[in-house]
Amino acid sequence: RIIGKSGEPLIRKGVDMAMRLMGEQFVTGETIAEALANARKLEEKGFRYSYDMLGEAALTAADAQAYMVSYQQAIHAIGKASNGRGIYEGPGISIKLSALHPRYSRAQYDRVMEELYPRLKSLTLLARQYDIGINIDAEESDRLEISLDLLEKLCFEPELAGWNGIGFVIQAYQKRCPLVIDYLIDLATRSRRRLMIRLVKGAYWDSEIKRAQMDGLEGYPVYTRKVYTDVSYLACAKKLLAVPNLIYPQFATHNAHTLAAIYQLAGQNYYPGQYEFQCLHGMGEPLYEQVTGKVADGKLNRPCRIYAPVGTHETLLAYLVRRLLE
């Protein structure tokens, strides 16, 4: 027992050190200013960034307000750093809707529309002021419909008319993904804009499976084998590339085969603003250093945007677990 007690501080220190090392690998900076400074090295090589303020769902109104302030400060900082580069060439921000309201669920639909939507609109107008892209992050499947309703309302705001910086994230492991793309294409047509759509494979697989089992559902909302998700991803990529006037595709993948397939699907007549690849900070840079850059330097001359989490090591755990599962 004495040996056990004396070992506790050592174990604690070891865990803390491990978390810090992992944090340095996966987090761009503890503050947005630090993250912007750390990003310059890869920006000089042609990479772009989309920043995300780390943290999970808000549990109280105070949490939601703190996240709101954090996002506002980040947009101001990113906007100044962008210096007029625009939504395609400059940095952007990703926001999580569950961080903006403690009751973000279908059961609280009216409250969400009344209380969360004004916050989303306010952040989007601020992003427009600086002309930086703002992406609404994907979450669990039971929040998909409400997030699409919020997006639709946003797309028809008169103050945002004609601006193409609104973005939305879709997950290829969701069985509904191709149908969601059809809806987004229709929404872009009706609202007369070009939407930025980030296609990811999906990071909530374990919780989606467990939730479906606990609820006694007949089937799962997500594919149960990775190979199905890989095929779905390419099918969805093809749909996104087919409507370049309505969709700006952002292909987030660390899979070299998927990357090569999209490179071929998109054709060789690339033009700036056609599409971009994306990767997570600390995970995809070695692959994309072969992609981003001039053909004369042996690269593919295709843009890559790095998804860059910002936050302290205390806020890292949930994000880190998802990355380790990947």
Describe the residue ranges of each PLM region.
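Positively charged, amphipathic and often flexible ligand-engagement surfaces
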Residues: 1-326
